[in-house]
Structure formats: structure tokens, C-alpha cells
Amino acid sequence: MNYEAIIGLEVHCELLTKTKAFCGCSTEFGAKPNTHVCPICLGLPGALPKLNKKVVEYGMKAGIALNCSINKLCRMDRKNYYYVDCPKNYQITQSEYPLCKDGYIEISLENGEAKKISIERIHIEEDAGKLIHNSQGTFVDFNRAGVPLIEIVSNPDMRNSKEAVEYLIHLRSVLKAIGVSDCKMEEGSLRCDANISVREKGNKEFGVKCEIKNMNSFKALEKALNYEFERQIEVLKNGGKVIQETRRWDEENNKTVVMRSKEDANDYRYFPDGDLVSINISDNWIEEIKESIGELPHEKEKRFIEQYEIPKYDTKIITSSLEMAEFFEEATKISKNAKAVSNWLMGDISRLLNKNNIKIEEIKFSPKDLGEFIKLIDKKIISNSIGKDLIEEMFLTGKSPKDIVEEKGLVQNNNKEEILEIVKKVLHDNPENVTSYKNGKTKLLGYFVGQVMKITKGKANPKIVNEIILKELNM
């Protein structure tokens, strides 16, 4: 029996406002616990909230970028529940009348085809506080309480974990590109909950869904969905019934575990917040927001392919990060060689970033340095092999390529007479290999080139070395 997954994502995105959603407290991350609080975000009696206009603007901006329609009249509601990190015993959110609705994201499938993932709604809400656990007990930090969020709710259009990850990657790149969030999953400014059920292929009815929480990376999302898919299938195959519940991803044991039974909307007793007026949005305001949105990632990807003629795969990776795309364009302006910039970014530079667990914006050398570095190779001042050592030195020290080349004497040797003498010595010292080459073992050419490069410490121009060796062997 073949099963398929039915997956929808609820993505919570912290907005990059300087102050909280309903008060003037700072949203700065990492401050001393309970220092960015006031009577409003602590829910003290008599304190009245006032909606931050920037929150509405950022929510609209996200909605427009994600192809949503904007509700011209929306309101704030109270979601009632008791938990220690919720000081008011209710959360200010939007239920019946969200800010945005009916959007979509287009993702690329593994076979190269495009697929639309529809977005049901985007609504504004405030974040809760944060629980801190240590050996002395559990403490609550309310600095995060009242920080503005948008929740982006997809329809259950995804059929496997890879589609879900692709959707989240695309969503993150859009939100970062338009400047509404830094989307740092490790800091919790982008959090994702997944709803997943399974059904037999061909069946139109949805199965019983479970919600999964505590996934703070793309890898965790993929692993959690794969595990839950297999778990639910196993339950059904054994004659059981999947129970609607909330589960969390246990990273240490690579499995989902039960948190609580799943609540329905009725359990939260939503009703309008009487302390906040309805939000009226004019056509002019919508147009202003539209005009403020720059180039979106999919538009940038299309332009890069046409303008720079670099491979689609490279373009997709480079444009998925605003910082990487900007680094690429600035380096290309200097070097006038987009293909080389792409190759170095996708190759050695990405390897060094991953090895040192840092991002492109934290790199020590500038895009201008990369452009100058590529010009040194293109002008034959240094060789490609020297370039690999040079880029690592730039990465570690932040020094300019010209300074390192001068300090270490790395200038490429293009002197044909000097190279000829070294070639003659290599061939003279390896008579058996020369005979083998002439008898048909042509792969030995690489050995001879390697010996010359070893003697010259990689400084000899490899093109000239190849030409001279071939000429000498064929005499």
C-alpha cells in the first residue's frame, strides 16, 4: 500500500522593528533578562496597548511579496490561554480578519518542474516570553514578550519533506530580501511548526494530522517530517489510529515525542481586543508599500542567468542569500569576470565558510579584494594553484591579494627560457617515464607537469609548462 504525506507549515517570523508590537520597549536580542519590559508587555492592570504602525507596514510588505491580497479592514483579537510565559493570559493576534490572505510561493521540484504552494493567510501577533531552564529551576525572561511576529500559514499543499524545506528556504530568502526580518533560525527569529498527516495515494480525504514543533533548522524540519511520516504509516499498518496531538522534534534521539493533545480554535476562545481599534488600510498605503519592495529573489535569479550567464544551480545558491548576491555583484564589477566570481564563491570560498561555520557577511576580505584576486589570475600574474593558497590566506588574514602576493613572492613565472631549463631537468631525471610516455602512456604528462610545478613551488605558468613539455617529448 502506497502512502503520501499531506504537509502544511506555520512559520513565525520576528519583524525587524526597533520597538515591540504594542509598546515602546526595545526588541534588541540578547539583552539582560527582564530589562526590556514595561506595564504593557507585562500585562499589568490598567496598561493600554498601542499598535506599532511599522508592524502593519512590514506585514503588508511580506504579504505583497508573497502574492497575497491585503485586507483593507482587519482587527486584533485575543487568543486566551494560560501558560507561564504569557503574562496577560492571552496573546494579541488576528483570527477572523487577518492582514493578508490568498498568496503563494513557487518552488522548484527535484525534476526541475515548478510547483505553487498556496498561502492561506498572514496575520500579526505578539511573541511570548522565554523559559530558561538551569540547575536552580525554571525562570521566565519577558524581554521577548510583545515582540512583533507575522505568522505565515500555508495550505497543506506539500507532499514530502523536500518540498517543505524548499518552501521554507524560498520564504526565508524573500523575507530577508525585503528587509522585514533577519530570519536567524538559531536566534528564534524564524520558527517553523509543521502539520502532517498521511493517506493512501489516490485517496482525496485527509488523514488525522499531528503538529510538530521545535525545528530550528532546515535539516531538523526535513528529518522530523520524514520520521513522522514513517511513524504514522507504521501506526496505520498495525491497525491503529493516528491521534491528533502536538509533538516536538527530539534532536538528540532523532524522533518526535508527544507534548500534548492538539487544541482546536474553540479552545482558545478568540474574541476582538477591545483596547485596540480596527486597522483601516487605504489603496494609497498599499501602493506605497508595493513601491518600497525591491528586486525579489526569483527576479534576481532570472536576471543573473540572463545578465551574467552563469549556471542555473550556481545562480539559485547565490541569489538565495541577499548578502551573497551583493558580494557577487560587487566582485563582478571589479573583475569583469562573472563566471570566475561564481566559481570561487561556489567552490573554495563556500568550503572555507562551511569549515569555519561563518556567513559571507562575516568574511574578512571584501568583494573588491575578490575582484582584484580574479584579475591577478586573469592577467597571469598568479596561477590558479597559487590562487587556492592565496584565497585561504585572504580568508584567514583579511589582507588584500596584492599585499600577500608581494609579501610572499607569489608572482607567476611566465619566463619560457627558465621554464624550459626546469622541464629539461625533469625529463633528464626521469628517462624511464619518458620512454613509457613515448610508448603510449600519455597520462604521464600530468606527472611531468606536477614535477615542474613542485620545483617552482606552483609559480610556473601551467599553460606554458604543458606546451614546453609536449614540445620536448615530441622532438
Swiss-Prot record:
Gene3D superfamilies reported for this sequence: 1.10.10.410, GatB domain, N-terminal subdomain
Reactions it catalyzes: L-glutamyl-tRNA(Gln) + L-glutamine + ATP + H2O = L-glutaminyl-tRNA(Gln) + L-glutamate + ADP + phosphate + H(+); L-aspartyl-tRNA(Asn) + L-glutamine + ATP + H2O = L-asparaginyl-tRNA(Asn) + L-glutamate + ADP + phosphate + 2 H(+)
Keywords from the UniProt entry: ATP-binding, Ligase, Nucleotide-binding, Protein biosynthesis
Keyword Manganese: no
SUPFAM superfamilies the UniProt entry points to: GatB/YqeY motif, Glutamine synthetase/guanido kinase
SMART domains attached to this UniProt entry: GatB_Yqey
PROSITE patterns: GATB
GO-annotated molecular function: asparaginyl-tRNA synthase (glutamine-hydrolyzing) activity; ATP binding; glutaminyl-tRNA synthase (glutamine-hydrolyzing) activity
Protein's UniProt keywords contain Transmembrane helix: no
Family to which this protein belongs: Belongs to the GatB/GatE family. GatB subfamily.
Protein name, as recorded: Aspartyl/glutamyl-tRNA(Asn/Gln) amidotransferase subunit B
Gene symbol of the encoding locus: gatB
